[in-house]
Curated annotation (Swiss-Prot):
This is NAD(P)H-quinone oxidoreductase subunit 5, chloroplastic. It catalyses: a plastoquinone + NADH + (n+1) H(+)(in) = a plastoquinol + NAD(+) + n H(+)(out); a plastoquinone + NADPH + (n+1) H(+)(in) = a plastoquinol + NADP(+) + n H(+)(out). The gene is ndhF. It is found in: Plastid, Chloroplast thylakoid membrane. Its EC number is 7.1.1.-. It comes from Lobularia maritima (Sweet alyssum).
Amino acid sequence: MEHTYQYSWIIPFIPLPVPILLGVGLLLFPTATKNLRRMWTFLSIFLLSIVMIFSLYLSIQQIFLSCIHQNVWSWTINNEFSFEFGYFIDPLTSIMLILITTVGILVLIYSDNYMSHDQGYLRFFAYMGFFNTSMLGLVTSSNLIQVYFFWELVGMCSYLLIGFWFTRPIAANACQKAFVTNRVGDFGLLLGILGLYWITGSFEFQDLFEIFNNLILTNRVNLLFFTLCAFLLFVGPIAKSAQFPLHVWLPDAMEGPTPISALIHAATMVAAGIFLVARLLPIFIVIPSIMYIISLIGIITVLLGATLALAQKDIKRGLAYSTMSQLGYMMLALGMGSYRAALFHLITHAYSKALLFLGSGSIIHSMEAIVGYSPDKSQNMILMGGLTKHVPITKTAFLVGTLSLCGIPPLACFWSKDEILNDSFLFSPIFAIIACSTAGLTAFYMFRIYLLTFEGHLNTYFLNYSGKKSSSFYSISLWGKEEEKNLNKNFGLVPLLITNNTKRASVFCKKTYKISNNVRNQTFITVENFGLNTRTFYYPQESDNTILFPMLLLLLFTLFVGAIGIPFNQEGIDFDILSKLFMPSINLLHKNAQNFVDWYEFFRNATFSVSIALFGIFIAYCLYKPFYSSLLNLTVLNSFQTWSSKRIRWEKLINFVYNWSYNRGYIDAFFKTSLTESIIRLAKQTNFFDKRIIDGITNGVGITSFFVGEVTKYIGGSRISSYLFLYLSYVLIFLTILFFFYFEKF
C-alpha cells in the first residue's frame, strides 16, 4: 500500500499530455491534428479512466485503514525561507478524486457527440483536459500555496470554457463577469493565506492546523486578527461556490456549452469552494464567529437561490440557481459543523445535477433542430412542452434527477438532504425553518421545470389565447408571427396551427409524428397564410446513444450512490461506507450522540421532509399542469379573477415573485448601480485628471519652453553676438538686483 501512495503525485499529471499535445499539434500540424480528433477524445477518456482506477484503489485503502498520507519535497530559497510542495491523501481527497474522475469521464463521452458539429471541438477537449488536471491538482495539494496555484488554474479554465463561443457578445461578457467576480474572492483568499503564514510560519496543512490550534488554546495571538484571516480565507469559497453575495456570475456561466455546465456544477469549479472549506474546517472550527458566518451565508444562499429559480424561463439558468441553493445547503452543514452531511450532499448532488444538466443538453440538442441554434429559443422552456413522447429516455432520466433533487426516497439526495435538515434543528430553529421551507421550494421549481418541458403539447407551434395580452404563466409567443388581428379571439384555446407543405424544417429531422387522439378531438384552426413560409411541423427526436449512455450511467449513480451513507449503524457497528471513511469525523452537533440510529426518529424526520417535498410538487402541479391540459379553457379560468379581491392579491404576489426571479433579486442591478457605474465614473474622472491635469502640466511646461525659445530666437535674430549680448545683459541685471538687496540689509 505504501508503494501505491508513493506514486500518488502523478495523479494530476496523467490527463495533462492531451491538452499539451493538442496545443502543439494545432499550432504545428493543424490539418493532421483535426483529422485525428476522435483519437484525442479516446486518449482523454482513457487517461482519466486510469486516474479513476487509481482513485478507487486509494479510496478502498482509506475505507479499511482510514489513514493520512503526505509526501513533501523542500525547495530551499535561502536560509530563512523554503518552499515545500507535495501531495496529501486523506478521505476527503479520495472522495473528490472519485467524484472528479467519474463525472469527468461521462461528460467527455457525452461531449464527443454534443460538440461534434462545433469547429472548436479539439479546443474544447484541450480546455477540458486542462480543467480536469487543475481540479485533480487542487484536491491533492499538501499546502496552501499549491492550493492557490491550482485554484487560479481552475478559474482560468472556467473562464476559457464559459467564453468558449467568444464570438457571441453574451458569452464574452459572461466569462468576463465570472473572471472578475472570482478575482474578488481570490484576492481575499490570497490575503488570508499570507496572514495565516505571518501568524504560523507554515503553509502545510498538518503543521498549520497544529500550530493554529495551539496558538488559540494558549491565547498567544490576537483573536481579532485570527478571525479576520479566517474570514478572508472564506471569501475565496464564497466566490468560487457562488455564495451570496458573489453568486452573480453563476447564471451567466450557462452561456458556455452544456457539457461544461454539467462539469462546473457537479464536480469541479463550484465543488472547489466546498472542498476548501472542508479542508480548512479545523481552522474555522476553533473560531465560533466564523462558523456562524459560514452557516449564515449558507442559509441566505439556500433561500435566495431557490426564490430566484422560481420563474426562470431558461432551463439551464433554472438549474444553475438550483445548484446555488444546494451549495448553500452544503455550506450551511459545514457552518453547523456537520462535516459528514456536507460531503454526503456534495456527492449525491454532484451525480444528480450532472444527470439534470446532461438531460437538459439532450433536450436542447433536440430542440435546436426545430427552433434553430439560438439559446433564446432552444433553451426556452416556454417553447417546449409535450416532449415525453418524443424523448422518452431523456424524460425518464430527467425525472429521476428531478425527484432526487426534490428529496424523494430512495434516491440519492434524499439521504443527504434529510441529514442536513435534521442537523439544522439541532443548530438553530430559525435556520431549520428556512431550510425546510426551501426544501419545499426546491420541489416546486424543479417540478415546474419538468412540467414546462415534458407535459402538455409542444408549444413551438402553439399560439395560446387566454383573454390577456401578457401573462407570466401561459403567454406563448409564436416566432415570426404577424399581427394577431387575423385570428378570431373568441376561441378559449387554440391548441394547434396547421399549415400545408411537405418541406422539411431541418436537416436533422427524419420523420414526423402523428397527433394524439386527445388533441385530435379539440377545436382546430387552419391558417392558409399567416405571414410565414409554409412548412410542415416537425418534432424533436431522441438523442444519439453517445449522449444517452452517460445519462443512463448517471441515472444508476443517482439511484444507488445514496447507499454509501444510509444510516444502517446499530449498537455501535458502522455498516455505511461514509462513516468508515470519515472516522474520526468532525461533528459538533452529535458529540454525545449514540453510535447507532434510532429508526423511529429517522422515519419520523424522513416523513416530515418528504411531506414538504410532496407538497411543493403538488403546488407545482396545480399551478402549471392545467395550463398545458388540452381540456382547460383559459378564458373561463381568467373570468374567476373578477370574483374576489383575493384573486387580485394572488396576482400581485405572482407578479412580485416573477419580477424578483426575472430581475435576479435586483442584486445585479444593485451591483451595476453602486459598483459598476461608480467605478466607470471614477475611471472617467481619473482619465480626465490624467489627461487634463497631469498631461496638461507636462505639456504646458513643454509649450512654454518652446515659445520662450521661439521668442528668444526672434529677439536674437539667430546671431551669436546677439545671444551673448542678451546673456550678459541678464547676468548684469541679476547681479545688480542681488547687490541692491545685499547692501539694503546693512
